[in-house]
Amino acid sequence: MTKKAILMIAAALAAVSGAAWAQRDPAYAAARAAGEVGEQPDGYLGVVGGGNAQLRALVSNINIQRKAAYTQKAQASGATVEQLAFTSGCNLIAQTKPGEKYRTPDGSWETRGAGAPVRDSRCV
């Protein structure tokens, strides 16, 4: 599987996945808008700070759905789950809007400003 093919699959997955989860669960949209959750370079959603049990359960559920989607796409494409998850993470961070949280490559949480987010140098 070529890197270009992996990127195309992951981009499609990220675009559908992020939008679908945000529309399905108002609690997710509210937590994202409040800066309580954010996108991570590994393709999974993270809790900013400790969060409460309900928020951690929400994030865990979304991440289970993401892993299932990454696994399905990986099996169909010949890529690894980790490759698809990482590429999706790159795309999901790029798709954040100003005011939303994301994790930088050094592990710190940042709030997206008007400019481009800081992403892993391997992101295309």
Regions found by a protein language model. Give the residues of each.
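Amphipathic, charged alpha-helical segments and their helix-to-coil junctions
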Residues: 23-39, 44-50, 54-57, 85-124
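Bacterial N-terminal signal peptides that target proteins for export
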Residues: 1-8
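N-terminal, post-signal-peptide region of Sec/Tat-exported proteins
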Residues: 44-76
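Sec-exported extracytoplasmic/periplasmic mature domains
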Residues: 33, 63-78, 89, 93-97
